[in-house]
Amino acid sequence: FIDGNDKAVSIHSPQEAQKLGISTVYQEITLCPNLSVAENMYIGRSNKIYQNWKKMNEDADKILQNLDIPAKASQQLASCSIAVQQMVAIARAVDMDCKVLILDEPTSSLDEQEVEKLFGLMRDLKARGVGIIFVTHFLDQVYEVCDKITVMRDGSLVGEYAIKDLPRVQLVSKMLGKELDDLSDIKGDQPTEQKSESEEPLFETKDL
């Protein structure tokens, strides 16, 4: 549902998606590192054409401050950390009246502190009414920030579940397509360490 509209739509381009209020931030940063933060926020947007650089930077700084993003509009994007670059991409989406934000593996290149900063921004956006689709393979993060889990396997939908109703072991079971008993068998089949009581070498090499 977007603004109460439950009708299926056919989307053929990113521009069409953006008009519907759907924006995506990809795993690989798709911004221009040689441009400023503000330029990246407004580039390619016909509804945001600035003739005044000062005004553009002021507007961008307001958005960055409002979202508590530690960056200046005038600084070069390349000088920002990967986490901040992703936040700038999110700020761009929010300023485009984004109602649904798709985050594709946003934490894959971040350290723990950067992940927490990103999660703080995600929680803030959630409080503002922005729906977030968080694509990740880090299960700990799923249980930390998500309300629902959608499981897909081999390109097909397995199901959608509330976080509180799906223990982690059951999630793994659904992801792998195996019953819980099968998972127990797999765990039990792990090789155990074996030690020889004999002092005779089992393997030797010389003159390598």
Each language-model region and where it sits:
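Glycine-rich phosphate-binding loops of nucleotide-dependent enzymes
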Residues: F1-L208
